């Protein structure tokens, strides 16, 4: 702020030393330095406030410019897309209003009617599937009534197969028993063999 060189400071120091003397010169220097610091602080505050005001003014101008912009300043493609979206939305609203006016109902009532129609359609589909299943079951029972001999033959064949399986199981079990008895006779302990002649002699 104060563009003072070394020579100017030296000149001021000599003048102060001559005028004030060596005793009051240090006090005067401290007082002057305090004033200089205060003045510099005030100047810095003023500069900061001015800078903030300028920034605020620039920001306000930018906001005003942004508010002044409209769809005409946009690109033609974007403006066309926005117009098409608006037109389609208005058309859908007009169709709903027209349908509601023809049936003397509101939009919510129209939605409720559509939901009821969907529920009715689903119930009809369920009833149709039940009818088809019932008709298939009836047809199968009719076929069984018309050809009972075929059904009885199938049942008899199943019974014969089961009986054949049981006979095979019995034969296999008997064969296992015979083999087991043969092995027991073959590997009988010698004591039993020795006792058998003695018993025969006693009997004779």
From Swiss-Prot:
Protein name per Swiss-Prot or TrEMBL: Sec-independent protein translocase protein TatB
Membrane-spanning parts: 1-21
Lipid bilayer topology: Single-pass membrane protein
PANTHER family for the chain: SEC-INDEPENDENT PROTEIN TRANSLOCASE PROTEIN TATA, CHLOROPLASTIC
Gene Ontology terms: biological process: protein transport by the Tat complex
Source species, domain of life: Bacteria
Gene3D superfamilies to which the protein is assigned, alphabetical: 1.20.5.3310
Self-association state and partner proteins as the record states: The Tat system comprises two distinct complexes: a TatABC complex, containing multiple copies of TatA, TatB and TatC subunits, and a separate TatA complex, containing only TatA subunits. Substrates initially bind to the TatABC complex, which probably triggers association of the separate TatA complex to form the active translocon.
Record localization: Cell inner membrane
UniProt feature, compositional bias: Polar residues: 154-166
InterPro entries, per the entry: TatB
Molecular function via GO: protein transmembrane transporter activity
Species, as recorded: Mannheimia succiniciproducens (strain KCTC 0769BP / MBEL55E)
Function of the protein: Part of the twin-arginine translocation (Tat) system that transports large folded proteins containing a characteristic twin-arginine motif in their signal peptide across membranes. Together with TatC, TatB is part of a receptor directly interacting with Tat signal peptides. TatB may form an oligomeric binding site that transiently accommodates folded Tat precursor proteins before their translocation.
Family classification: Belongs to the TatB family.
Principal location: membrane
Annotated stretches, region: Disordered: 154-204
A single Gene Ontology CC term: TAT protein transport complex
Keywords assigned: Cell inner membrane, Cell membrane, Membrane, Protein transport, Translocation, Transmembrane, Transmembrane helix, Transport
């Amino acid at each position: 702020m104060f563009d003072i060189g070394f020579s100017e400071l030296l000149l001021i120091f000599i003048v102060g030393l001559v005028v004030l003397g060596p005793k009051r010169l240090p006090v005067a220097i401290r007082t002057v330095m305090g004033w200089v610091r205060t003045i510099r602080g005030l100047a810095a505050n003023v500069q900061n406030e001015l800078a903030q005001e300028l920034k605020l003014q620039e920001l306000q101008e930018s906001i005003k410019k942004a508010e002044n912009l409209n769809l005409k300043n946009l690109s033609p493609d974007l403006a066309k897309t926005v117009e098409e979206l608006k037109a389609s939305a208005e058309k859908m609203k007009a169709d709903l209003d027209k349908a509601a006016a023809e049936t003397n109902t509101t939009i919510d009532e129209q939605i409720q009617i559509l939901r009821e129609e969907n529920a009715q359609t689903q119930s009809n589909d369920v009833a149709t599937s039940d009818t088809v299943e019932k008709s298939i079951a009836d047809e199968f029972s009719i076929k069984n009534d018309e050809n009972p001999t075929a059904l009885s033959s199938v049942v008899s064949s199943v019974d014969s197969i089961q009986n054949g399986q049981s006979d095979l199981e019995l034969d296999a079990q008997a064969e296992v028993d015979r083999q087991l008895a043969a092995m027991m006779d073959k590997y009988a302990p010698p004591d039993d063999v020795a006792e058998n002649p003695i018993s025969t002699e006693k009997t004779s």
